[in-house]
C-alpha cells in the first residue's frame, strides 16, 4: 500500500460523471457466465482488485476471460468441464469472492482451497460455513471460522434455512450451493438484503422464486443455465461518495449518470431525501436492475435522522460516508442495527468513529452503530484507511470540509472498488 496520499481538493464540485460498474453485480456476472457453457459478454464491469480475484480463479478453473474495451468476453467450457485447481485459490481482500465461492465450489464438489489476504484472514466465515454444512458441504476453516477454507467433494442437499443476519453474501453462498442439490432450498430472510443473485440467476435462465422474505430454489437448477450478455450499471456504493461530497460542499451541483438503483440497494437515496437533501432522479429505466441519473446539489441545514431496521441492509456499504453526512446535520443522528459493519474490511463502526474523531468530528460508537453529533472539521491530523477502501474514500470526502490538505495513509486501498476515484473527484473540482 502507498504510505500516504495528500488530498488537496476544494469546492465547489460541478459536472457530470459516471462511476465504475457495480462491484456486486460484476462478481456475480463473472461467476454465472463462467458456469454457463458458451460465450457471455459483460459490459462496463468493475475491474478493481476484488473482481480481478474472481476472474483469476475462474481462469484457473479453465474459463477464458478476455478484457476488451470496457467489456469482458467470457468463454466457458461449462461447469461440468472445470479443472481441479492445483494451487490455492487466492481471493485477495474480497469477502464476496471468498464467501460466494465457498458455496459455489462446495456445490460443484471441486477439491480446492480458498484463501485471501491478512484482512480476509480476520473476517468471520462461520456464518457461511454453518448453513453450507447443513447442506452436507464438506468444507472446513481454521477454528471453523477463518480462511483458508478447505473444500472437498460432497453431495449437496436442500435445506429450509432461517437467516441469522441480513447478509447478501451468506444468502448468495447458500443459493450458489443449492444450484447442484436434488432437493429445493427455502431461505427465509430477517430483512430484505440486496437481491442481485436472485435477479441475475433469472437473467442467466436459472429458475428461482422470491416473494417477500422467502426465496425458493428449483432442484438441480444449474441444468437450466444459459450464457447471457449483461450490462453492469454504475455502482451506487461508489456514487455515494459523490452524492455526499456534493451535499456538503457549498456551491456544488453534480450529476451522476447510469447508477444502479435496485430498491434493495438504494438506501442512501431514501436517507438523503429524509434529511432534506437536494437530490433528483431522472432518465430512469425499469427492469430487474433499474438505473437512473442522479443530480445532487449542495444542501445546508440537513435534518438529523435515525437509520435503523430495514433501511440498514439497503445502505450497509454506504454507512461510513453517510455518517460523515450526518455530522453536517442540524441535530444528532443515530445509526442502529448495523452490527454487520463489524465484519467488513475493518470494524467500520470503530474505524469510522476513530478516523472522523481524529479530524475533530464528534461520533460515539455503540454496539450496533453510531451516535453522530453536529460537528466540524477542526484539525488536520494524519488519518489512515486501515486498508479499507470505503474508509479511504470517506476520508477524502471529509477533506472537502477542510481549508488545508489532508494526509491519508494507505489510500491506495480505494483501488479495490474504485481505481479512478481521486482523478474523478479532481475533475469535478476543476469543472467547478
From Swiss-Prot:
Subcellular location: Cytoplasm
One Pfam family from the record: EPSP_synthase
Catalytic EC class: transferase
SUPFAM superfamilies: EPT/RTPC-like
SS bond partners: none
Keyword Amino-acid biosynthesis applies: yes
Reactions it catalyzes: 3-phosphoshikimate + phosphoenolpyruvate = 5-O-(1-carboxyvinyl)-3-phosphoshikimate + phosphate
Single Gene Ontology MF annotation: 3-phosphoshikimate 1-carboxyvinyltransferase activity
Keywords tagged on the record: Amino-acid biosynthesis, Aromatic amino acid biosynthesis, Cytoplasm, Transferase
Full protein name: 3-phosphoshikimate 1-carboxyvinyltransferase
Taxonomic source organism: Staphylococcus aureus (strain NCTC 8325 / PS 47)
Species classification: Bacteria, Bacillati, Bacillota, Bacilli, Bacillales
Gene: aroA
Amino acid at each position: 500500500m502507498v504510505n500516504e496520499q495528500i488530498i488537496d481538493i476544494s469546492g465547489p464540485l460541478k459536472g457530470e460523471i459516471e462511476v465504475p460498474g457495480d462491484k456486486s453485480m460484476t462478481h456475480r456476472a463473472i461467476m454465472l457466465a463462467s458456469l454457463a457453457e458458451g460465450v457471455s459478454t459483460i459490459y462496463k464491469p468493475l475491474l478493481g482488485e476484488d473482481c480481478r480475484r474472481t476472474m483469476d480463479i475462474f481462469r484457473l478453473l479453465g474459463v477464458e476471460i478476455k478484457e476488451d474495451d470496457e467489456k469482458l468476453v467470457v468463454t466457458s467450457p461449462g461447469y461440468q468441464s472445470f479443472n481441479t485447481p492445483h494451487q490455492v485459490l487466492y481471493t485477495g481482500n474480497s469477502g464476496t469472492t471468498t464467501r460466494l465461492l465457498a458455496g459455489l465450489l462446495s456445490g460443484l464438489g471441486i477439491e480446492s482451497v480458498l484463501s485471501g489476504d491478512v484482512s480476509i484472514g480476520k473476517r468471520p466465515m462461520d456464518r457461511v460455513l454453518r448453513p453450507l454444512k447443513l447442506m452436507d458441504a464438506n468444507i472446513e476453516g481454521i477454528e471453523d471460522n477463518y480462511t483458508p477454507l478447505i473444500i472437498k467433494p460432497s453431495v449437496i442437499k436442500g435445506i429450509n434455512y432461517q437467516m441469522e443476519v441480513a447478509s447478501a453474501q451468506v444468502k448468495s453462498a447458500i443459493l450458489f450451493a443449492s444450484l447442484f442439490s436434488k432437493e429445493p432450498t427455502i431461505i427465509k430472510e430477517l430483512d430484505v438484503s440486496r437481491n442481485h443473485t436472485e435477479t441475475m440467476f433469472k437473467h442467466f435462465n436459472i429458475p428461482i422464486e422470491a416473494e417477500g422474505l422467502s426465496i425458493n430454489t428449483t432442484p438441480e437448477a444449474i441444468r437450466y443455465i444459459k450464457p447471457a450478455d449483461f450490462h453492469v450499471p454504475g455502482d451506487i456504493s461508489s456514487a455515494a461518495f459523490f452524492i455526499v461530497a456534493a451535499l456538503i460542499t457549498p456551491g456544488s451541483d453534480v450529476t451522476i449518470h447510469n447508477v444502479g438503483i435496485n430498491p434493495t440497494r438504494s438506501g442512501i437515496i431514501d436517507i438523503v431525501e429524509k434529511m432534506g437533501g437536494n437530490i433528483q432522479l431522472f432518465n430512469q429505466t425499469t427492469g430487474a436492475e433499474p438505473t437512473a441519473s442522479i443530480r445532487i446539489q449542495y444542501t445546508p441545514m440537513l435534518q438529523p435522522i435515525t437509520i435503523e431496521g430495514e433501511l440498514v441492509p439497503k445502505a450497509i456499504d454506504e454507512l461510513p460516508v453517510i455518517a460523515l453526512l450526518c455530522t453536517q446535520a442540524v441535530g444528532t443522528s443515530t445509526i442502529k442495527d448495523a452490527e454487520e459493519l463489524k465484519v467488513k474490511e475493518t470494524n467500520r463502526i470503530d474505524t469510522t468513529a476513530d478516523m472522523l474523531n481524529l479530524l475533530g468530528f464528534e461520533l460515539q460508537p455503540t454496539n450496533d452503530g453510531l451516535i453522530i453529533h453536529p460537528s466540524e472539521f477542526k484539525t488536520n491530523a494524519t488519518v489512515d484507511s486501515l486498508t479499507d477502501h470505503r474508509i479511504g474514500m470517506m476520508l477524502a470526502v471529509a477533506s472537502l470540509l477542510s481549508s488545508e490538505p489532508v494526509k491519508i495513509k494507505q489510500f491506495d486501498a480505494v483501488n479495490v472498488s474504485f481505481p479512478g476515484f481521486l482523478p474523478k473527484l479532481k475533475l469535478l473540482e476543476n469543472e467547478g
